[in-house]
UniProtKB/Swiss-Prot annotation:
Heme b b562 binds at residues 83, 182. A ubiquinone binds at residue 201. The keyword Electron transport applies. It is a multi-pass membrane protein. GO terms for biological process: mitochondrial electron transport, ubiquinol to cytochrome c. Its cofactor is heme b. GO terms for molecular function: metal ion binding; ubiquinol-cytochrome-c reductase activity. It is found in: Mitochondrion inner membrane. This is Cytochrome b.
Amino acid sequence: MTNIRKSHPLIKIVNHSFIDLPTPSNISAWWNFGSLLGFCLIIQIVTGLFLAMHYTSDTMTAFSSVTHICRDVNYGWLIRYMHANGASMFFICLFLHIGRGLYYGSYTYFETWNVGVILLFAVMATAFMGYVLPWGQMSFWGATVITNLLSAIPYIGTTLVEWIWGGFSVDKAPLTRFFAFHFVLPFIIAALAMIHLLFLHETGSNNPSGLISDSDKIPFHPYFSIKDLLGALILLLIFMNLVLFTPDLLGDPDNYIPANPLNTPPHIKPEWYFLFAYAILRSIPNKLGGVLALVFSILILMLFPILHMSKQRSMMFRPLSQCFFWILVADLFTLTWIGGQPVEYPFIAIGQVASILYFTIILIILPSISLLENKLLKW
């Protein structure tokens, strides 16, 4: 009788994905973030489910229902802070996962990469809608500012914004809609993650050298299952430290003030993980131009497979490309810092320089450096 894990229709899918999966023997800790993202998604779905049991999506009671969760529900404060900080951990893992993909040339797996970019958009949409739900000052004004960006679309913009608002301002209708979408999107993300894995397992994982590793593969379990478990424990340690000791570190104090349409906060800004894109948006004086730059700053990831000019896949043996990759990372940190600063000199100028540098490195410098490195290989 054959082993049940290899013959059972359902169990063999799990077996081929997590147990007998042939994995390159030299993948480093940078390959842990895929499983950590799955771990984060599970935490978010479970905590979100319990929060949804007590939350009410009505403008009159949304803020007080969150207060009620924190004060009166058993361990409600823990569930709420795990969910809020879980989003931050999700994005940290996501950015590191994308950074790994860019550095080691994983984007040459075209389908896997494009599904990944769609996943990034879905996660960003979910996080934005979730930020609106507590109905604090930043929730309300963030929703107003971001939804208002759609009015930059020619001809249909204003109609589109009023359609999303269900009226002439952000009120009960968008809050209820955002709650509905915020609830359903994580399940769509889970389905997309499965498609992401399906495409990945068609080709097998990339590895730090960027070379074909068919001749040197080992089973996923126990080698990498243990490695992933260690990664999950380290993530959990950092995560619970954040939740239990400094739960409001990454939040905005303005969100502890109930939403008031008559009182605008001095600095409207999104959560930290959107600040880089927000800085790019603010760097362009024209509204439509800013919106296009904002969208393209994420969509540009889809161009990486086309912009790859090097004969080598990974940046592991390309010191010039490495140099500009890390300049790009530093530039993203700069944009994140600028996004949280007021719109005044010198922050506007720094933001504009950083935005130009971001697009220049990706579209011009990295492909050019790759071509130069190809020449140096012959030399």
